[in-house]
């Protein structure tokens, strides 16, 4: 699917994506003005709760309590995050096999093995990965990977809803050349934005990607009542319910790889369903788009 894309996009915050030659200016991570989530182990954190649901080890009692409340509200949430993870591994293997060597993971969360850099390095040991998150615990974990001598990994502090400063901060690492094809990952983050904002944000990012770039998106789709309950349970973030039509619209201007937007459990490159995929409450919808 294709559509006209604006040449000077703005983020939901009104930031114009500009810079020399029309590209975002290099902005040091500390200068983005992005609000950070303060580290407090006595308060629940969604990234650490997610890590717990995936079987990770970087969490505290309040995070496990939050995860327990989420499971009580919607017992399928653990399966959802695991479906998302399995899809991401398949998607990254596919993209890496196409020769993409640059990756930007928006709202990365705590690294879970296999992490993005571990997956893509199966195909190219020199692939560069920059992780973006607004949680200092996540950033510290990810930067520790680079501190171990990996010259092709970095992490920047950023609010994914503000494309201009995020793209500038990523560029400032020196690991990503926006003039070359990039794989942009937005996995399980767009349900924290309303549909209109999510469309604006994804359009702002994709409009500045080089031709041949790949965009991976996954979105948790549940019943509106469940999203409202989760919002009340975890008051640090609001969760929005997106329809299949919303998720398709996040790929506006991109060519979708078959089977297009589909249930993450069934998504495989080149697979084509004989009938429209059934929508079900509590599913993860996923897809990969390519820029022209």
Question: What are the residue ranges of the model-derived segments?
Answer:
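Conserved beta-strand signature within the Rossmann-like core of class I S-adenosyl-L-methionine
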Residues: 156, 182-186, 201-202, 208-220
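Short "lid" loop at the C-terminus of a central beta-strand within the Rossmann-like core
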Residues: 189-192, 220-224
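Short alpha-helix
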Residues: 238-264
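Core SAM-dependent methyltransferase catalytic element
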Residues: 267-292
